[in-house]
Amino acid sequence: MIILSGIELTVFLKGYLHVSKISGENDELYILNHLGEYGLMLDQIHDRLNAVSKMYPIDAVEITSKGFRHSEYEIPEINYPKIASDDLHAIVGIGRAWIEVNVITRTKDAIIKAVRQGDFWNGYI
């Protein structure tokens, strides 16, 4: 198991949004976090993604909230890889959701590349 660490950035853009910045060896991954917590309609999600993408190169969106799945965001109209995460807000949520990748080189940068390409699968408890 490889755990990638990062920081959650708070972005104030038409309300607040969270973006994870995950560091690899030489690369970084940016994820718009927990879509289910914002109460946004699809057109508003697209609007926020366009706005945030001007600040950070968004690579994926998180379709979980504190480890709980929000399948309503697993739609092709959101044209980003959709990632599951437990988001580690409380001990009860640790390990509830994760991603798995099958990479030849087991490096953080290889994992980041796989996520960008959507070459992973989500796991849930």
Predicted regions and their residues:
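Acidic beta-strand-to-loop metal/phosphate-binding motif
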Residues: I31-L35
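Charged catalytic cores and adjacent phosphate/nucleic-acid-binding surfaces used
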Residues: M1-S5, V11-D27, E37-I125
